[in-house]
């Protein structure tokens, strides 16, 4: 009986692995969604990617993005087909949560028509027509990984097609050259803070000034009812700087964590 059980488990494990494309594998940074299968996989030692930082469209035959990140480097791209009992939204939410728990800095997050054209994201950005579906059924996230992988970008895109098949695209680009300063939009920061309850901004400088300070001020001004706990080695300095920019002291508390960068916890 024990031998039969071991054989059955072995067959099950082999079947699960056999469903994946030969030679494919998950990204180290991103756990696989349960029962998802890799149906497309590609690695390239050097490839250029242009990732949107805003809605994507085509005007007069030209591709237009509200913002973009352009980088070249080692690319690993894979497409998961999701099990029919789970939605693409569930898989996307799981991926988003995993990346933020790894202290990745969010650069852009959109859903539905806010992303722009699904056809352009599928074909012009990711080069995979399998990812084309209704604009209302898509979601997209771009993050920058924390040190020592600060020159790596991870993009995640989910879609439920018209035939109800759901897919999740995940790819990591390890840039050949150091990435410049990359900032998320205030709307993306606020949306992620509310969705996850917390955020770690690992690329925030120790000295609160310049573009990061302006970004956090604009983020907190989008919803004046939001209160946050600030943690990190320089949280006190950031709180003082935000207060100096007009953010009410009553909206900010200090936490105990001594993490690198700045950690925000939503106080509800």
UniProtKB/Swiss-Prot annotation:
Q: List UniProt keywords, sorted A-Z.
A: Disulfide bond, Periplasm, Signal
Give the signal peptide range. 1-18
Q: InterPro entries from the xrefs?
A: DUF4892
Q: Which Pfam families match?
A: DUF4892
Which region ranges are annotated with the description Domain 1? Answer: 24-184
Location within or outside the cell: Periplasm
- Domain of life according to the entry: Bacteria
Coarse class of the primary localization is periplasm
Name the segments for region: Domain 2.
Answer: 185-268
Please name every pair of cysteines joined by a disulfide bond in this record: 110-115
Gene Ontology cellular component annotations, sorted alphabetically: periplasmic space
Domain writeup: Folds into a unique two-domain structure. The structure consists of two domains, domains 1 and 2, which are connected via a long linker. The interior of the C-terminal domain is not optimally packed, leaving a cavity lined by hydrophobic residues unoccupied. This cavity may sequester a hydrophobic ligand.
Subunit annotation: Monomer.
The UniProt record's further free-text remark is: Was identified as a potential drug target.
Q: What is this protein called?
A: Uncharacterized protein PA1624
What is the originating organism of this protein? Pseudomonas aeruginosa (strain ATCC 15692 / DSM 22644 / CIP 104116 / JCM 14847 / LMG 12228 / 1C / PRS 101 / PAO1)
């Amino acid at each position: 009986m024990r031998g039969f059980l071991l054989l059955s488990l072995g067959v099950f494990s082999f079947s699960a692995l056999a469903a994946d494309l030969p030679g494919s594998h998950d990204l180290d940074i991103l756990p696989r969604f349960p029962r998802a299968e890799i149906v497309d996989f590609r690695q390239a030692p050097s490839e250029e990617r242009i990732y949107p930082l805003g809605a994507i469209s085509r005007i007069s035959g030209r591709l237009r993005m509200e913002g973009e990140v352009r980088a070249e480097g080692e690319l690993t791209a894979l497409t998961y087909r999701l099990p029919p009992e789970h939605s693409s939204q569930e898989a996307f939410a799981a991926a988003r949560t995993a990346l933020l728990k790894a202290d990745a800095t969010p650069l852009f997050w959109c859903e539905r028509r806010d992303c722009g054209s699904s056809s352009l994201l599928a074909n012009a950005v990711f080069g995979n027509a399998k990812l084309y579906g209704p604009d209302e059924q898509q979601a997209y996230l771009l993050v920058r990984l924390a040190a020592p992988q600060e020159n790596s970008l991870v993009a995640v895109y989910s879609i439920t097609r018209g035939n109800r098949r759901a897919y999740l695209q995940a790819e990591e680009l390890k840039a050949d050259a150091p990435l410049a300063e990359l900032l998320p939009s205030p709307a993306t920061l606020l949306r992620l803070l509310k969705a996850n309850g917390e955020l770690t901004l690992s690329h925030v400088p120790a000295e609160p000034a310049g573009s990061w300070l302006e970004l956090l001020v604009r983020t907190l001004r989008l919803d004046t009812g939001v209160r946050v706990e600030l943690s990190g080695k320089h949280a006190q300095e950031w709180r003082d700087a935000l207060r100096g920019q007009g953010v009410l002291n009553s909206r900010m508390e200090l936490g105990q964590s001594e993490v690198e960068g700045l950690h925000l916890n939503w106080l509800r």
